[in-house]
């Protein structure tokens, strides 16, 4: 966006007072230019002030996920070195020696690779190499050594799988009998142990694997998903019996959009696939729970472990189980399976979840299962099912919805799909239509689901084919459900799946408050049994098998946080059976064990909590991203909705951009498992009526409380350390800390600090310093108070204002919009409620400047501080500074105007370019858009607004035909601010055309006629006179001259092309003819605008250019003095407020405002802090 004032060079006030001076070193050999790079500290802390102390810096590092893991590296390196050095395996001893030599060689090669004159090499070795690795050659080598040792140790640690069965504590080597091992009372006998004939180090690796497994289960809630899948397929005669092959062409393949399951008669006798398998599955064929019927036969009772097993022979996908955990479930599962799995987890945990429909009777045909007669399904709502309905009351027919018929042919098939296809096909030829609005008078024949809950009943219905009527809603029905199974039916990209959580309720229990929670010990036992079963192929019979690669899974988990996981494992490992290597490792680690016990669990929990919050965002993105192509097909200029076929929304409601109920699963783990690692759960904040709160606002409060607990824990830990400044090496630019006079801890702390103060990103310490510079300034506190007042007001519709804050509040959404417009995903905060898109702007802004959270946008916060400081500076003393800027930059006679893009005013702005989806609501947003996509409006540059609405009639050549402005409750979008020759939001051609149009129709830029006469009389500039004459020449005189003089004489030349008139004569001529143009000024008998303080309601005109239309109001230098935020004079106060907001966001204006205050003198002890400040420009 262009502002009126522009500066080519951005003034960085906060660096004033900072200096980088040369360190004078006696007999120094580096060149002066090299020494210029050495930072001269002015503080022994990171920066002067409590937040810049050494302890505060370390606290910040140890509570930051990207930095905290480095603090355990020193103790781990001690332990690993001892293990490698004392190991009984000589190859391991040799690896340590070779690695140390490699590190030495690596250091030499790195140093020799520095391109620098020899005399400067010491400077750049220190700054470019050692400062990044703890400050010394020894710390650099230690860091490199650790990286290579931990990589090798990880490979050795997971080279073997040490999961075993130990009945009565005795290692069993088999044979393993399913009927014995499948009994839950046996599961406690599984564990990790070296084999009888073990190799050196096997005992240690087995113990560490056990601890890593324990951490994995506790911190991530591993879940084994059981599933049977039935894939779509085409019948022998092709999909053309139902779908429109002429319209769909090569897009028509068996898929989620065009589902089909061949009938039994179309499946070869020797193939047991599709409908054949489905019929056998719902009958419970080969199920292990022989006391039950139907699908329940695949679910063992609670006392049998609640195991869920599907025979591989009854699934088109032979992999009938999948292991996931809370940190990879979003990435591992397809969107439909993901939603269903999380919904089922929440059901088992007795937490709030989205309601799914229940299928009372499972049909033996898959086609008649995904398309269900409404009488055979209950708990269906507009958010969880789709259907086709009779609608004789709604005469407005949406073509995009009716076009869905083009996906089908008119079928007379007696099946559900045939009837559904026929019904859709009749949409545009009768009173049948696809509707997105529920009505109590409507009825539905068929319902289509993407996820549903099965009851354990079967139906012997005839063989049929299926479909889905896209995105209509259903009438609620009320039935008593019985015998609901803890399973989910899912319609996904592959086919239809039956999903269950294996052992799901077995390892759940009720706590003292009767709340459901995990029994982590039972969960460990269950998972070990299943992993051992897969490892040893201990299945009931050949019909059952699955894969559970535990070792590979543990390694993947380990590598995500290997430093913190390993140190936590060492803390909990019992070294009873010790070889020399393990004994040495234990002794080396024991020196730090007590200290690590206080820190490592908190650090690991902090990182996992952060990752779980990130999983919430990932879930929202995954479920929303599936709709991109669907919406494109509907929203493009030439829509092709039939290509979406039977695609629909998932039955999980999105609120404010978040799938709140599904995200409740991650919140459950955060609050019920991990919060206790860093503090204690505050039930009054996290729960309501014994259920977790799910709104975004409540989740943020929970997050903030947890972050406060983390800060307290880390602060308590650091306060137990002796933190002092370590002597600085020559030429170093950084502060080094010493911890407890211990080299390992000292290295660890400095590695953590270096990760925190990464010079490529804005660091929290630089932010804290800069924030303090603002908050300690009285003017800023005044500015902050003003903005809080603006934010708290609702911006009433009246254009009259009693305070500056009132006017600014009416247009503050323009400032919020500047944040929203930069978003790649503009629907990340959901769809607007009742078209109130301003609420989304505000959400985007508030989140961008939120100073809580794990990923604070420091740059956005500081930019906001500059803005509000500048805003206060502009408005004080009745807009004095704002007016001074305008006076300095708008010359007398220069044309300027305020304009609105009328194309935006007149267009539907509810869904620009389809950013809020489509009328089909594939996102299942609580505020479904009812507007078709407007492809002519760019959401990145039109949403500036005012309360004032410039209603006009088409203009004649004179400006006197303009109508007064009016006001609107919601305001008017399309506001383009103040436009001049050098600055405009409009395209250059449009801006120039409008300037030319004004020049050809107005002399208002000169104020009154008397003002211009005075100016002409006083000027000494020939070019100024020529410019005025040219402007007058473009106008038609409104009266004839009584003295016979005309403007044409001004341009007369003699025989040699010199002007016929001299300067004085030209002045006199212009003064003489000016009365002929009186109608182009304000009334010559009235005082100039600058003196008419009571003049109100200036009027807008209409201008058309290139097929587009604009409403504009000419603005002149004489308008400036009467501008006000509290009274509407020549320009409405809310328009003035919008102009002030634009000016406050201009970086050049911010420079000017900040230069008016006393510049802070920063005392900094570490160049990395200065680097962080530079990134905050």
UniProtKB/Swiss-Prot annotation:
This is Uncharacterized lipoprotein MG307. Belongs to the MG307/MG309/MG338 family. Residues 1-26 form the signal peptide. Keywords: Cell membrane, Lipoprotein, Membrane, Palmitate, Signal. The lineage of its organism: Bacteria, Bacillati, Mycoplasmatota, Mycoplasmoidales, Mycoplasmoidaceae. Its main location: membrane. It is found in: Cell membrane. A lipid is attached at residue 27 (S-diacylglycerol cysteine).
């Amino acid at each position: 966006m262009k502002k009126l004032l522009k500066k080519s060079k951005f003034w960085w006030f906060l660096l004033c007072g900072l200096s980088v001076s040369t360190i004078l070193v006696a007999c120094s050999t580096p060149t002066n230019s090299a020494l210029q790079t050495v930072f001269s500290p002015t503080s022994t802390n990171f920066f002067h002030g409590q937040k810049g102390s050494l302890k505060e810096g370390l606290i910040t590092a140890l509570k930051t996920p990207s930095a905290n893991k480095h603090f355990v590296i020193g103790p781990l390196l001690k332990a690993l070195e001892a293990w490698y050095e004392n190991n009984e395996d000589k190859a391991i001893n040799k690896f340590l020696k070779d690695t140390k030599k490699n590190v030495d060689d690596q250091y030499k090669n790195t140093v020799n690779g520095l391109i620098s004159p020899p005399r400067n090499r010491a400077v750049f070795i220190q700054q470019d190499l050692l400062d990044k690795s703890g400050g010394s050659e020894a710390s650099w080598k230690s860091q490199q050594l650790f990286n290579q040792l931990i990589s090798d140790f990880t490979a050795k640690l997971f080279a073997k799988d040490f999961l075993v069965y130990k009945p009565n504590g005795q290692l069993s080597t088999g044979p393993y009998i399913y009927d014995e091992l499948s009994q839950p009372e046996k599961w406690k006998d599984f564990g990790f142990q070296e084999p009888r004939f073990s190799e050196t180090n096997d005992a240690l690796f087995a113990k560490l694997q056990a601890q890593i497994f324990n951490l994995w289960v506790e911190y991530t809630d591993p879940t084994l998903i059981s599933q049977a899948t039935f894939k779509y397929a085409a019948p022998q005669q092709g999909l053309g019996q139902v779908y429109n092959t002429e319209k769909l062409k090569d897009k028509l393949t068996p898929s989620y959009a065009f589902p089909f399951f061949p009938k039994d008669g179309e499946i070869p006798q020797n193939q047991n696939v599709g409908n054949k398998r489905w019929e056998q599955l719902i009958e419970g064929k080969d199920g292990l729970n022989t006391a039950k019927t139907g699908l329940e036969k695949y679910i063992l009772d609670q006392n049998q472990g609640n195991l869920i097993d599907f025979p591989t022979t009854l699934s088109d996908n032979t992999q009938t189980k999948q292991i996931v955990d809370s940190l990879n479930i979003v990435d591992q599962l397809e969107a439909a399976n993901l939603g269903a799995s999380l919904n089922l987890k929440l059901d088992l945990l007795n937490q709030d979840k989205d309601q799914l429909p229940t299928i009372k009777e499972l049909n033996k045909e898959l086609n008649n299962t995904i398309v269900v007669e409404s009488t055979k399904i209950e708990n269906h709502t507009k958010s969880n099912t789709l259907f086709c309905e009779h609608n004789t009351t709604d005469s407005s027919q949406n073509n995009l919805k009716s076009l869905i018929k083009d996906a089908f042919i008119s079928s007379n098939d007696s099946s559900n799909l045939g009837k559904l296809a026929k019904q859709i096909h009749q949409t545009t030829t009768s009173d049948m239509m696809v509707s997105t609005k529920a009505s109590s008078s409507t009825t539905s024949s068929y319902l289509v689901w993407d996820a549903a809950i099965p009851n354990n009943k079967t139906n012997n219905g005839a063989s049929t084919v299926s479909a889905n009527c896209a995105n209509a809603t259903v009438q609620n029905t009320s039935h008593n459900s019985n015998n609901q199974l803890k399973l989910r039916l899912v319609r996904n990209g592959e086919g239809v799946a039956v999903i269950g959580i294996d052992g799901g309720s077995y390892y759940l229990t009720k706590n003292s408050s009767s709340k459901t929670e995990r029994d982590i010990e039972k969960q460990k036992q269950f998972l070990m049994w299943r992993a051992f079963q897969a490892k040893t192929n201990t299945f009931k019979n050949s019909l059952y098998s699955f894969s559970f690669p535990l070792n590979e899974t543990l390694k993947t988990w380990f590598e995500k946080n290997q430093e913190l996981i390993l140190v936590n494992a060492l803390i909990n490992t019992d070294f009873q059976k010790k070889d020399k290597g393990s004994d040495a490792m234990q002794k080396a680690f024991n020196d730090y064990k007590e200290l690590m016990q206080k820190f490592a669990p908190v650090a690991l929990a902090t990182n996992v909590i952060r990752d779980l919050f990130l999983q919430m965002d990932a879930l929202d993105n995954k479920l929303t991203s599936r709709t991109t192509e669907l919406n494109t097909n509907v929203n493009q200029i030439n829509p092709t909705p039939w290509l979406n076929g039977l695609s629909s929304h998932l039955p999980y409601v999105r609120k404010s951009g978040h799938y709140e109920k599904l995200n409740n699963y991650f919140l459950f783990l955060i609050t019920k498992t991990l919060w206790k690692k860093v503090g204690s759960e505050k039930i009054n904040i996290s729960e309501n009526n014994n259920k977790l709160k799910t709104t975004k606002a409540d989740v943020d409060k929970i997050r903030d409380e947890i972050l406060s607990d983390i800060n307290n824990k880390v602060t308590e830990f650091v306060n137990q350390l002796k933190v002092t400044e370590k002597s600085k090496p020559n030429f170093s630019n950084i502060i080094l800390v010493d911890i407890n006079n211990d080299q390992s801890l000292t290295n660890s702390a400095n590695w953590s600090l270096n990760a925190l103060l990464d010079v490529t990103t804005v660091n929290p310490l630089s932010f804290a310093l800069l924030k303090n510079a603002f908050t300690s300034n009285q003017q800023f506190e005044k500015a902050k108070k003003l903005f809080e007042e603006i934010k708290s007001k609702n911006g009433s519709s009246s254009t009259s204002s009693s305070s500056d804050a009132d006017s600014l509040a009416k247009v503050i959404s323009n400032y919020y919009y500047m944040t929203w417009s930069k978003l790649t995903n503009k629907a990340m905060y959901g769809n607007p409620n009742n078209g109130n898109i301003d609420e989304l702007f505000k959400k985007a802004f508030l989140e961008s400047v939120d100073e809580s959270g794990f990923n604070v946008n420091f740059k956005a916060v500081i930019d906001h501080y500059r803005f509000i400081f500048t805003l206060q500076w502009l408005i004080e003393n009745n807009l004095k500074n704002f007016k001074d800027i305008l006076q300095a930059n708008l010359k007398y006679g220069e044309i300027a105007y305020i304009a609105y893009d009328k194309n935006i005013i007149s267009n539907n702005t509810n869904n620009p370019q389809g950013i809020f989806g489509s009328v089909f609501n594939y996102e299942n947003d609580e505020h479904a858009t009812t507007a078709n996509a407007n492809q002519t409006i760019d959401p990145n540059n039109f949403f500036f607004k005012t309360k004032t609405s410039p209603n006009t009639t088409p203009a004649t050549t004179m400006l006197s035909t303009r109508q007064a402005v009016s006001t609107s409750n919601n305001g008017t979008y399309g506001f383009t601010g103040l436009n001049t020759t050098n600055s405009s939001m409009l395209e250059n051609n449009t801006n120039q055309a409008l300037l030319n149009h004004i020049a050809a129709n107005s002399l208002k830029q000169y104020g009154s006629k008397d003002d211009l006469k005075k100016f002409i009389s006083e000027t000494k500039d020939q070019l100024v006179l020529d410019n005025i004459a040219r402007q007058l020449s473009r106008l038609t005189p409104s009266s004839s001259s009584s003295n016979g003089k005309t403007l044409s004489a001004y341009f007369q030349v003699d025989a040699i092309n010199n002007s016929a008139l001299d300067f004085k004569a030209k002045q006199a001529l212009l003064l003489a003819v000016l009365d002929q143009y009186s109608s182009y000024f304000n009334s010559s008998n009235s005082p100039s605008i600058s003196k008419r303080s009571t003049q109100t309601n200036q009027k807008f005109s209409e201008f058309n250019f290139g097929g587009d239309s604009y409403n504009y109001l000419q603005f002149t230098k004489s308008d400036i003095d009467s501008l006000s935020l509290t009274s509407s004079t020549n320009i409405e106060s809310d328009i003035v407020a919008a102009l002030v907001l634009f000016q406050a966001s201009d970086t050049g204006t911010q420079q000017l405002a900040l230069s008016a205050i006393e510049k802070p003198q920063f005392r900094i002890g570490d160049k990395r802090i200065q680097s962080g400040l530079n990134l905050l420009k």
